[in-house]
Amino acid sequence: MAALVIREFLEQHPEVELIMVSREHFADLFKAIPRLTFKGVSLDDYKGIFGMHKLAKELATEFNPDVVADLHDVIRTKILKRIFREKGYKVSVIDKGKEEREILTDVWNLDKKPIRSTVEKYADVFRNLGFPVELSHEFRIQQVQKSGIGLAPFAQHHGKMLPLEKSYELARILAKKHSLFFFGGGKNETEILEEWQHKIPNTTNLAGKLTLQQELQKIAELEIMISMDSANMHLASLAGTRCISVWGSTHYFAGFLGYGQKIEDVVHVKDLTCRPCSIFGDKECYRGDYACLEEIDIQQIIDKIQPGEKEFAEE
């Protein structure tokens, strides 16, 4: 999400050059942004408080920044923030809104309202440094031939993932009329998707076969991406592709809908008052039944791709 905000920020401020400091494997997310230098770091080289002091010294020496923006606000960046402030740098930090998140995820709160989107919170960091930013809230469709549908059926946490039997049935139905491409990561996910590919004609498993840059390019070439509330939804935004997103214990009210993606393309159980019970999907279901996922009908997804065409699972 940050990459799209940074791109628009830099477009609106041609006088600014930005140094993005993050883990090396995120470099491909920022490659196409003019006037951005990506500084990849290995956290193993900067352990503990002394490691953060070492990193801060290296960054100050190499880049001599005018100001510092913290878009993450985690333990490591909190240490860096303090070090840079002690050195006299102006530092702006994202406000994650802990209190409003707690109110939103209170299962007894029956009057839940959307909180400020994460992309606007990113933009606020730059605004607080004196740079006005107006976000378009639109992703940019790449000028490529689009065909096929992508399906990323996995998520990091149980509370965000449609039951695999539902995703499998969805794949079986969609592959009758569309070329279908599976996305995933890790050995277990790859093995499952390989099995699906063998069982379902007109499908291709891409899990474990592409670099991040290649994955972004493939997503850009898709007509539609189907994803859980996961990184693949945000990759679709970065690649300029419409994404139908599935939400379980999480909710787009928390501000994490993919940049430029439409609420109309959200699939969820609307009338469950306990949702969202979690911001990241990492909490156990207090009901014990994960109704937020079990009650999703895959026809909801099919209707957004093939309006008016009813499909029924084989007995």
PLM segments and residue spans:
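Catalytic machinery of carbohydrate-active enzymes
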Residues: 1-315
